[in-house]
C-alpha cells in the first residue's frame, strides 16, 4: 500500500474504491459539535429558475450574434489579414500592425490551403515511394570515385578572425612617501623646481642648492617677495613634505655662522644642531635672525619688523630688477659693446636721469610716488622745470661731452613753458568777437601756440587741421580756380513728399491701406528664388551684418531687429558706425551743357556741405522706397510675407526693379519679371555700373511706360570706393555716405546719357574691384593675345594709355604693332583718339632708344601733359577713361612737384619704387607670355625657320655664324622662343 511521509510519520493512502465505500461515520470530528459550520438548505423557487432561464437565453442569443458577426467573409478576411500582419514601431513609440496587401493575403491563403491538402494526402499514404538513383542523374565522370562538391558559385570561405591582444597597462604600485622621495630625487638631480601646494591658495616653490658639495632644500617664503606674514609656512600642511626633503638632502655641514643673507627658506632636519637649538618643531625653515638667534619660518612671529630677514641683500635685489627691466628695453645692438666706464659712473648717470624725470627722496617710498601721481600734468612739468633750475650747476658739471646734449635739450624743451604771451594776446585781440569760420580757425591755432610744450596732441592735431583748411581756402581765393563755383553749389532735398499714383489708387489698397500686389506678387517669385537669399531668424543675423563688395565692406543694421527693452541700450542702438566723411567735390555733381543736373547730384545742406547719411533702421518683410525724402514701407507679396529675403552679393540693384514692379500693370507683370530674369540680369551681371543700370531701366521703361514715375529705393554714394549702395529694408549701420537725390526712374535714366558729364555714372552698384589694377592686368594679358587686344581697341581704346606705367609695356605693344592697329581703327571714327595712338607710338620709339630706366620715365612724364590735354576733349563713355585720366594727372603733378625739388638740390627718392614696379611689371608680362597659346608659339617658330631657310640658301656655307646671329635677333624680337634651346640655332653653332 502506498504511503506519504509527513516528517517521521508514515500515512497510508487508501485506494479509490476504498475511499468510495468508506462511510462518513468513520471520520474523526476535529471541530466541536457546537462550533461545526452547517450549510443551509437551498430554497430555489419557480421565479429563480425562470430568471436563470432568461439569462441563459440572452447569453445564447449574444453568442449567436457574435458568431454571425465573425462568420461574415469580410470579418474573416480582416482577421486573417491581421493574423498575417507584422508588428512595427510607429511614430511616438507606438506599436502598430504592418498589414499586407489583399493580393498577398489571397496568395498566402492559397499557399496554406495547398499545404494542408498536400499534408492530408501525405498522411493518407498517397505518395511516391520510388527511389531515384543518382547514377542516372549525374554524369559518368562524377559517379566513379570522385568527390562531389555541393558548394554554390557564391561560396566564400570565412577566415578565422584574429583576436588583437591589448597590452595591459603596467601600474607601478608604491607607497606615497616612497613616490614623493623618488620625485624629489629626480628634481634634485636635474635641478627642477617643485611646487608645493597646500590648502586654499597656499603655495611654495622648492629648489635645491649646492652648499659645500651637498644639496640643501630651499623653499620660497613670503618675505622674499616683499610680503610680511606672522607665519610664513604652515607646518601642519607640509610636514610630510619637509620630512621627505630632509631625506634627500644632507645639511650636517651647515653651521650657524653660514647663515647669511640669501639663506632664507633653507630646510634643516630634525637631527640638525640648529633645529634642536632654535626650533620647537621637528624641522627648521630659516627665516632670519632676531635678538635670540635664528627665526623659524614655521613658527609664529608677533613683531615681524624686529626680524632681520635672511633674503638677498638690497643691492643684489636692486640689480636683479635693474638687469631684468634694462635688458627688456635695450635697443638692438649694432656693435660689440665694451666696458669703457666703471660702475660708479654708470650709477651716477642712471641716478641723474632718474631724478630728472622722477624726482623722489627714496624710490622705495610709496608716499614719494603718490605725490607725483596726484599732481596734474602742468604741475608735474613745473616741478621738473624747478628741479632743473635748482640743480643747474650739477647738470653743468655732469655735462662733460656732447653725447648728452640731445638728452638735456629734450628735458629742457619738454619742461619749459611759453614765456612770450604778448604776441599771442595781440592775436587774440584781433580775432575776438568774430564768428566767421576763418577767425575761429585762427583762434584754435593761437591757443595751441600759447600752450607751447604743454599742448596736447588732440589740440595740436586740431590746429594743424585748421591751418590746412585755411591754406586751402587761401589758395582757392588767390588762384580763383573753378572750385569757387562749386562752393556756391546748393542741392537741398525736397521738403515735399513724392507722390506715387499707384500707392494712392484705392483699388490697389486693402482695408488697412496696404498695397495689394495681386498677380505682381506671384510673378515676383522669379526674382526672389533666383537672386535673393532667405534669412532664417532662428539662425541669427550675425552672418548678414557685414555686406561685402570687392572694394570694401558695409555693415547692415539687420542686427537691430533684436530690440532691447532697456532704454539706454535702445538709444545705443540708434548710433551708427561712421566712415571717413568726404567733402563736396566735382565727383558729387553732374553737368550737361554747362548746367547742373540736380537730380543726378548729391544732396547738400543749406551751407553747401554734403548731407551725410544717418542710421537707417531695419524692418522685416518690407520693400522700402523713397530716396532722399521720408521712406515708404510696402509689404512684400503675400506669398513671401512670412519669409525674409536679402539680395545676394552683387545683385542689390534688383531692389530698383522691384520698386518698378509696383507700378507695372498686373496683366504685364509676367513679361516684366521674365524680361528682368532672362535678358537684363545676364547682361548686367554682378556689380554693374550705374550707367548700365540706368540703361536697363530705360529699356524697361520703353516696354512698360508706367514704370517711369516709380519711386526709387534709397541710394547712398560712397566716393571712397566709387560705389552706389542701394539700401533695402535692413537699413545701414554704416553712416557718413553721400545721398543721391534721384527719386524716380526718370531721374535715374538720365545717368544713361553719354552727354552727361558725371563721375558717378561710372560707379558700380554694390561695389567694384580696384579698376586700374584690373585694367592693367587685362592690358598685359591682351598684349600676347591679338583677339583680346582687338576687342579692347574696339570697346575701350583708353586702356592703352595705362601702358604708360611701365616702359616695358609700351615696348611690347609697339613690337606687337598694337598702336598701328589702333590708328587704323580710330583715325576715322574719332580723330582725338587716333591722335593719342600716334603720340604713344612716337613716345615708344624714343623710349626704346633710351637704355636707362630714369631716362625712359622722364620721356613718359614729358609726354603726359600733351596727352592730358587731348584726353579732356574726348568723350568719357568708356570705363578706362577715369583711370587713364587719373594716371596722367598724377604723372603731371608729380613732375611739377619734383621739378622744384630738383632745382633746389633735393634728391628724388622714388627711384627705388620705380625699379620695384618695373620688376613686377616685367614679371607679370613674362607670366602672361608663358600662358600664350601653344599654336601661336609653333606658328612663330615655323615662320622664323622658314625665313632662315630662305635666306640660308643665299648665304655662303662658311658664314653660318651670321645666320645664327640673325636667328637669335629675330627670336629676341618675337619673345616666343629662347634661341639657346632652338634646334636650328644649335645646328648653326655646330656647323
UniProtKB/Swiss-Prot annotation:
Record note on modification: Potyviral RNA is expressed as two polyproteins which undergo post-translational proteolytic processing. Genome polyprotein is processed by NIa-pro, P1 and HC-pro proteinases resulting in the production of at least ten individual proteins. P3N-PIPO is cleaved by P1 and HC-pro proteinases resulting in the production of three individual proteins. The P1 proteinase and the HC-pro cleave only their respective C-termini autocatalytically.
GO (cellular component) term, any one: host cell plasmodesma
Database matches in Pfam families: Peptidase_C6 (PF00851), Peptidase_S30 (PF01577), Potyvirid-P3 (PF13608)
Active site per UniProt: 223, 232, 264, 652, 725
Residue span(s) of domain Peptidase S30: 170-310
GO terms, molecular function: cysteine-type endopeptidase activity; serine-type peptidase activity
Domain Peptidase C6: from-to ranges: 644-766
EC id: 3.4.21.-, 3.4.22.45
Protein name stated in the entry: P3N-PIPO polyprotein
Organism: Zucchini yellow mosaic virus (strain California) (ZYMV)
Amino acid at each position: 500500500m502506498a504511503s506519504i511521509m509527513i516528517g517521521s510519520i508514515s500515512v497510508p493512502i487508501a485506494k479509490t474504491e476504498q475511499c468510495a465505500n468508506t462511510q462518513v461515520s468513520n471520520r474523526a470530528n476535529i471541530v466541536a459539535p457546537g462550533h461545526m459550520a452547517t450549510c443551509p438548505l437551498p430554497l430555489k423557487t419557480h421565479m429563480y429558475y425562470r430568471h436563470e432561464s432568461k439569462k441563459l437565453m440572452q447569453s445564447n442569443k449574444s453568442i449567436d450574434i457574435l458568431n454571425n458577426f465573425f462568420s461574415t467573409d469580410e470579418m474573416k478576411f480582416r482577421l486573417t489579414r491581421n493574423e498575417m500582419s507584422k508588428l512595427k514601431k510607429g511614430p511616438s513609440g507606438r506599436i502598430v500592425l504592418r498589414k499586407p496587401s489583399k493580393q498577398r493575403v489571397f496568395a498566402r491563403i492559397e499557399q496554406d490551403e495547398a499545404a494542408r491538402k498536400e499534408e492530408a494526402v501525405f498522411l493518407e499514404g498517397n505518395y511516391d515511394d520510388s527511389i531515384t538513383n543518382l547514377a542516372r542523374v549525374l554524369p559518368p565522370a562524377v559517379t566513379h570515385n570522385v568527390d562531389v562538391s555541393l558548394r554554390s558559385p557564391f561560396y566564400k570561405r570565412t577566415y578565422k578572425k584574429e583576436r588583437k591582444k591589448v597590452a595591459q597597462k603596467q601600474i607601478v604600485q608604491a607607497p606615497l612617501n616612497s613616490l614623493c622621495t623618488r620625485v624629489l630625487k629626480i628634481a634634485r638631480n636635474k635641478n627642477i623646481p617643485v611646487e608645493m601646494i597646500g590648502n586654499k591658495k597656499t603655495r611654495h616653490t622648492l629648489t635645491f642648492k649646492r652648499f659645500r658639495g651637498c644639496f640643501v632644500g630651499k623653499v620660497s617664503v613670503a618675505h622674499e617677495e616683499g610680503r610680511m606674514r606672522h607665519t610664513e609656512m604652515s607646518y601642519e600642511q607640509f610636514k610630510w613634505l619637509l620630512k621627505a626633503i630632509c631625506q634627500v638632502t644632507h645639511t650636517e655641514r651647515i653651521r650657524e655662522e653660514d647663515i647669511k643673507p640669501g639663506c632664507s627658506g633653507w630646510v634643516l632636519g630634525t637631527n640638525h644642531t640648529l633645529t634642536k637649538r632654535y626650533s620647537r618643531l621637528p624641522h627648521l625653515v630659516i627665516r632670519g635672525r632676531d635678538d635670540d638667534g635664528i627665526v623659524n619660518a614655521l613658527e609664529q612671529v608677533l613683531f615681524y619688523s624686529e626680524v632681520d630677514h635672511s633674503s638677498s641683500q638690497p643691492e643684489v635685489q636692486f640689480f636683479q630688477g635693474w638687469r631684468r627691466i634694462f635688458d627688456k628695453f635695450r635697443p638692438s645692438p649694432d656693435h660689440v659693446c665694451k666696458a669703457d666706464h666703471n660702475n660708479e659712473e654708470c650709477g651716477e648717470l642712471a641716478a641723474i636721469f632718474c631724478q630728472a624725470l622722477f624726482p623722489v627722496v627714496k624710490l622705495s617710498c610709496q608716499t614719494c610716488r603718490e605725490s607725483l601721481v596726484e599732481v596734474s600734468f602742468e604741475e608735474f612739468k613745473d616741478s621738473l622745470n624747478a628741479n632743473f633750475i635748482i640743480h643747474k650747476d650739477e647738470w653743468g658739471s655732469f655735462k662733460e661731452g656732447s653725447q648728452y646734449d640731445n638728452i638735456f635739450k629734450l628735458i629742457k624743451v619738454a619742461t619749459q613753458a611759453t614765456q612770450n604771451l604778448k604776441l599771442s594776446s595781440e592775436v587774440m585781440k584781433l580775432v575776438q568777437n568774430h564768428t566767421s569760420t576763418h577767425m575761429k580757425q585762427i583762434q584754435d591755432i593761437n591757443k595751441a601756440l600759447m600752450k607751447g610744450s604743454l599742448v596736447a596732441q588732440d589740440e595740436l592735431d586740431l590746429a594743424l587741421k585748421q591751418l590746412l583748411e585755411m591754406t586751402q581756402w587761401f589758395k582757392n581765393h588767390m588762384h580763383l580756380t573753378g572750385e569757387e563755383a562749386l562752393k556756391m553749389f546748393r542741392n537741398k532735398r525736397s521738403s515735399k513728399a513724392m507722390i506715387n499714383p499707384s500707392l494712392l489708387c484705392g483699388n490697389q489698397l486693402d482695408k488697412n491701406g496696404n498695397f495689394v500686389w495681386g498677380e505682381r506678387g506671384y510673378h515676383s517669385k522669379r526674382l526672389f528664388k533666383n537672386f535673393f537669399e532667405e534669412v532664417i531668424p532662428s539662425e541669427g543675423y550675425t552672418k548678414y551684418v557685414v555686406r561685402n563688395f570687392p572694394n570694401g565692406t558695409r555693415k547692415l543694421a539687420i542686427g537691430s531687429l533684436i530690440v532691447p527693452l532697456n532704454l539706454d541700450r535702445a538709444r545705443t542702438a540708434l548710433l551708427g558706425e561712421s566712415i571717413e566723411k568726404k567733402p563736396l567735390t566735382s565727383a558729387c555733381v553732374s553737368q550737361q551743357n554747362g548746367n547742373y543736373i540736380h537730380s543726378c547730384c548729391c544732396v547738400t545742406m543749406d551751407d553747401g556741405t554734403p548731407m551725410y547719411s544717418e542710421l537707417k533702421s531695419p524692418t522685416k518683410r518690407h520693400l522700402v522706397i523713397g530716396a532722399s525724402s521720408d521712406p515708404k514701407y510696402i509689404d512684400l507679396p503675400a506669398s513671401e510675407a512670412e519669409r525674409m529675403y536679402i539680395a545676394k552679393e552683387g545683385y542689390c540693384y534688383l531692389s530698383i526693379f522691384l520698386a518698378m514692379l509696383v507700378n507695372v500693370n498686373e496683366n504685364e507683370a509676367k513679361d516684366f519679371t521674365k524680361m528682368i530674369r532672362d535678358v537684363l540680369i545676364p547682361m548686367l551681371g554682378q556689380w554693374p555700373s550705374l550707367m548700365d543700370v540706368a540703361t536697363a531701366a530705360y529699356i524697361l521703361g520703353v516696354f512698360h511706360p508706367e514704370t517711369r514715375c516709380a519711386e526709387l529705393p534709397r541710394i547712398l554714394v560712397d566716393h571712397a570706393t566709387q560705389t552706389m549702395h542701394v539700401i533695402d529694408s535692413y537699413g545701414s549701420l554704416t553712416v557718413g555716405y553721400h545721398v543721391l537725390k534721384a527719386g524716380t526712374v526718370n531721374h535715374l535714366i538720365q545717368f544713361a546719357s553719354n552727354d552727361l558729364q558725371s563721375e558717378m555714372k561710372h560707379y558700380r552698384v554694390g561695389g567694384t574691384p580696384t579698376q586700374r589694377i584690373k585694367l592693367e592686368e587685362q592690358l598685359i594679358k591682351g598684349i600676347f593675345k591679338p583677339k583680346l587686344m582687338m576687342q579692347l581697341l574696339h570697346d575701350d581704346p583708353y586702356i592703352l594709355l595705362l601702358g604708360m606705367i611701365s616702359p616695358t609695356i609700351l615696348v611690347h605693344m609697339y613690337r606687337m604693332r598694337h598702336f598701328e592697329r589702333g590708328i587704323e581703327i580710330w583715325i576715322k571714327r574719332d580723330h582725338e583718339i587716333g591722335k593719342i595712338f600716334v603720340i604713344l607710338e612716337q613716345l615708344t620709339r624714343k623710349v626704346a632708344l633710351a637704355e636707362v630706366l630714369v631716362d625712359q620715365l622722364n620721356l613718359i612724364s614729358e609726354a603726359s601733359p600733351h596727352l592730358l590735354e587731348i584726353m579732356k576733349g574726348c568723350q568719357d563713355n568708356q570705363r578706362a577713361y577715369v583711370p587713364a585720366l587719373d594716371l596722367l594727372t598724377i604723372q603731371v603733378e608729380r613732375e611739377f612737384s619734383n621739378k622744384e625739388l630738383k632745382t633746389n638740390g633735393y634728391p628724388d627718392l622714388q627711384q627705388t619704387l620705380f625699379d620695384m614696379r618695373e620688376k613686377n611689371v616685367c614679371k607679370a608680362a613674362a607670366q602672361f607670355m608663358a600662358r600664350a597659346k601653344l599654336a601661336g608659339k609653333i606658328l612663330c617658330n615655323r615662320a622664323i625657320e622658314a625665313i632662315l631657310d630662305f635666306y640660308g640658301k643665299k648665304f655662303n656655307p662658311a658664314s653660318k655664324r651670321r645666320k645664327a646671329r640673325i636667328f637669335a635677333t629675330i627670336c629676341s624680337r618675337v619673345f616666343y622662343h629662347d634661341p639657346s634651346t632652338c634646334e636650328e640655332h644649335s645646328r648653326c653653332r655646330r656647323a
